[in-house]
Regions:
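Class I S-adenosylmethionine-dependent transferase superfamily signal
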Residues: 1
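S-adenosyl-L-methionine-dependent methyltransferase catalytic module, highlighting the catalytic core
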Residues: 4, 10-114
Length: 117
């Protein structure tokens, strides 16, 4: 990215968070494992280290609050072979609440990076 990004450009990337509460809750049924689409999974620390190695600094993170509900709904279906809207909704609320109150983070996070000076 560094070569093609303008001087004040930003890199915006959204990734699932394998350290989130819902990832631990659903384990192998967590829908955001999503192989082969997601080949690697990152926490805040690991994605920050990766971009830092390539001369970028993290300037902001944002939780993808609605993604927790979607991932929970899909995970419920993977786990039980049934669409469980209420369970998925409740798990989404729990995951977002824990993610916002702890350092675990939400199910998915948006990271905004810029070049280091």
């Amino acid at each position: 990215f560094s070569r093609i990004l303008s001087k004040n450009g930003k890199v915006i990337i959204a990734v699932p968070n394998h350290k989130s509460w819902d990832a631990k809750h659903y384990k192998e049924f967590w829908a955001a494992w999503d192989v082969p689409i997601h080949l690697w999974h990152f926490s805040k620390d690991t994605i920050e280290k990766l971009f830092s190695k390539h001369n970028f600094k993290l300037i902001k993170t944002k939780p993808m609050l609605f993604d927790s509900f979607y991932v929970a709904l899909l995970s419920e279906e993977f786990k039980t072979a049934k669409k469980k809207f209420i369970s998925g909704f409740i798990i989404g609320i729990i995951s977002n609440t824990i993610g916002m109150l702890t350092k675990k983070g939400c199910s998915s996070t948006i990271y905004i990076f810029e070049k280091k000076n």
